[in-house]
C-alpha cells in the first residue's frame, strides 16, 4: 500500500488537524513522539499482535452468510466477525494498542469516554489486564440505555463518571474526558475510542483498527480467490469502518459507510453527519458535523448509542469529499429489521450499530448478481442491546 496521509500537520486534505488549547499541546506532542517511536519498533508491533492473538482471540472469523445470501437471492454476503473478539466488539483492537503505548510512556492511569459502553468495557478490560487505574466518562442518558455495560466496567474495576451536561451522550462524555485529561496529563493517558479528536488520534486509532481489514482482505482472498465487490461498515465516529476500509483503498472495490438515519434524515432526529452535516471543528478536529444555522452543534439521535455522535472521523470526511467512499444512512427501523433477519437466518444477533451496515448490505445484495460479493464488518454482538430489542420486538416500540 502507498496511502500516506495524514500529512505531517495531521491533515487529511483540509480535514483533521490539532485544534486544542495550549494547555494540551505538550501532552499531544508527547503522545505523537511516543506513537511514532512505538510504531517504528518491531518489538512493540509484535507485542501488540501477540496480545491480540493470545488474549483477545484474533484472528476473528470470516463467515459466509449462506442462508441470508440465498434468501436475498443476489450477491454472496460475508461477515467479518468482530463480534467474536473478547468483550464483544472491535473496540479491543484499539484499546489494546493504546494501553500498551500508555505503559510504554510510563502512564499509570487511563481516562476514556464511551457511548454504547463497548469502548468503556474494552478500556476497563485492558486496564485490568495491565494493572492501570481506569476512569470512564459516559453520558447519563447512555448510562441508562446501557446499564449492563456500566456494571461490566465497574465489575472490571473502573470508575464510571456520568456526564450530565448537554444531551448527556457521547459528545458530552468526550468533553468531560478531555477536561479531565487537561489537568492530569502528567500521569494519565487519554484512550480515545474512535478515529476522532486531534492528531495523532485519528491516525493512531486507524492503525490499531486496520487489523480488521488486513485480516478480512487476506481471508477473503484465501476463501474465494478474489476480492469482494463491495465492503460495507457502519459509521459513528468511524473506527470499525476505517479499519475495514483502509487496506482496500487502492483496490477496485466499492466502499460504503453507513450512518444512522434515526427517524429519517428529513427529520431532526438522526446522526447522519456526512449525509447532512457541514464542515466545522469538534473535539480538536476539522470535519463534518451536525450544526444549526448559527454554527451550534445539534444533538444527534439514533436508537444505537454507539452511532449518535455529531461529528465523524476526519479521514471519513476526506474520503467522502474525494468520492472514494460512498456514505449512506439507514433508519432505526431498517437496522432493527436487518438485525432480526440475521438472527433468524444465521443464528447471529448483531449489535444495533452493526445492523445499520447489514441493512445496507441486504439492500445492495438484491441489486447485485450471484457472482458478486459483499463483505460486511460485523462490528459487535447484540448482547448489550437485548433490553432495547425486547422493548421493540414485544410491541412497545422505541421512543
Curated annotation (Swiss-Prot):
Record key words, sorted: Amino-acid biosynthesis, Aromatic amino acid biosynthesis, Lyase, Pyridoxal phosphate, Tryptophan biosynthesis
Pathway given in the UniProt record: Amino-acid biosynthesis; L-tryptophan biosynthesis; L-tryptophan from chorismate: step 5/5
Cofactor field: pyridoxal 5'-phosphate
Residue numbers of N6-(pyridoxal phosphate)lysine PTMs: 91
Single GO MF annotation: tryptophan synthase activity
PROSITE patterns found in the cross-reference section: TRP_SYNTHASE_BETA (PS00168)
Gene3D superfamilies: 3.40.50.1100
Keyword Amino-acid biosynthesis: yes
EC number(s) given by UniProt: 4.2.1.20
Any Pfam family matching the protein: PALP
Catalytic activity: (1S,2R)-1-C-(indol-3-yl)glycerol 3-phosphate + L-serine = D-glyceraldehyde 3-phosphate + L-tryptophan + H2O
Matching InterPro entries: Trp_synth_b_CS, Trp_synth_beta, Trp_synth_beta/beta-like, TrpB-like_PALP, TrpB-like_PALP_sf
GO CC field: cytoplasm
Subunit structure, interactors included: Tetramer of two alpha and two beta chains.
Role, per record: The beta subunit is responsible for the synthesis of L-tryptophan from indole and L-serine.
Family: Belongs to the TrpB family.
Protein's UniProt name: Tryptophan synthase beta chain
Organism of this sequence: Halalkalibacterium halodurans (strain ATCC BAA-125 / DSM 18197 / FERM 7344 / JCM 9153 / C-125) (Bacillus halodurans)
Amino acid at each position: 500500500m502507498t496511502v500516506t496521509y495524514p500529512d505531517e500537520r495531521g491533515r487529511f486534505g483540509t480535514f483533521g488537524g490539532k485544534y486544542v488549547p495550549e494547555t494540551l499541546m505538550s501532552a499531544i506532542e508527547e503522545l505523537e513522539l511516543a506513537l511514532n517511536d512505538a510504531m517504528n519498533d518491531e518489538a512493540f508491533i509484535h507485542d501488540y499482535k501477540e496480545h491480540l492473538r493470545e488474549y483477545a482471540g484474533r484472528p476473528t472469523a470470516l463467515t459466509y452468510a449462506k442462508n441470508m445470501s440465498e434468501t436475498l437471492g443476489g450477491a454472496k454476503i460475508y461477515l467479518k466477525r468482530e463480534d467474536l473478539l473478547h468483550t464483544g466488539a472491535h473496540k479491543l483492537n484499539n484499546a489494546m494498542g493504546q494501553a500498551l503505548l500508555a505503559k510504554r510512556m510510563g502512564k499509570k492511569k487511563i481516562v476514556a469516554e464511551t457511548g454504547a459502553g463497548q469502548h468503556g468495557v474494552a478500556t476497563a478490560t485492558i486496564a485490568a489486564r495491565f494493572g492501570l487505574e481506569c476512569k470512564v466518562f459516559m453520558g447519563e442518558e447512555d448510562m441508562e440505555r446501557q446499564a449492563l455495560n456500566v456494571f461490566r466496567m465497574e465489575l472490571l474495576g473502573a470508575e464510571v463518571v456520568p456526564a450530565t451536561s448537554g444531551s448527556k451522550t457521547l459528545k458530552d462524555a468526550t468533553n468531560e474526558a478531555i477536561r479531565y485529561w487537561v489537568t492530569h496529563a502528567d500521569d494519565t493517558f487519554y484512550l480515545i475510542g474512535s478515529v476522532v479528536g486531534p492528531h495523532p488520534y485519528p491516525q493512531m486509532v486507524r492503525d490499531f483498527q486496520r487489523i480488521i481489514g488486513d485480516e478480512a482482505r487476506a481471508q477473503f482472498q484465501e476463501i474465494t480467490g478474489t476480492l469482494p465487490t463491495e465492503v460495507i461498515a457502519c459509521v459513528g465516529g468511524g473506527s470499525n469502518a476505517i479499519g475495514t476500509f483502509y487496506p482496500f483503498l487502492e483496490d477496485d472495490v466499492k466502499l460504503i459507510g453507513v450512518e444512522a438515519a434515526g427517524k429519517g434524515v428529513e427529520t431532526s432526529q438522526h446522526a447522519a453527519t456526512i449525509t447532512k452535516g457541514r464542515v466545522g471543528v469538534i473535539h480538536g478536529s476539522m470535519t463534518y458535523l451536525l450544526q444549526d444555522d448559527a454554527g451550534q452543534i445539534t444533538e444527534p439521535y439514533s436508537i444505537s448509542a454507539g452511532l449518535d455522535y455529531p461529528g465523524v472521523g476526519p479521514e471519513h470526511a476526506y474520503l467522502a469529499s474525494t468520492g472514494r467512499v460512498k456514505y449512506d444512512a439507514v433508519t432505526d427501523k431498517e437496522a432493527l429489521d436487518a438485525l432480526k433477519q440475521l438472527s433468524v437466518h444465521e443464528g447471529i444477533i448483531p449489535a444495533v450499530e452493526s445492523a445499520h451496515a447489514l441493512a445496507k448490505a441486504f439492500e445492495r445484495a438484491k441489486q447485485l448478481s450471484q457472482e458478486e460479493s459483499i463483505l460486511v464488518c460485523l462490528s459487535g454482538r447484540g448482547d448489550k442491546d437485548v433490553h432495547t430489542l425486547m422493548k421493540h420486538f414485544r410491541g412497545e416500540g422505541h421512543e
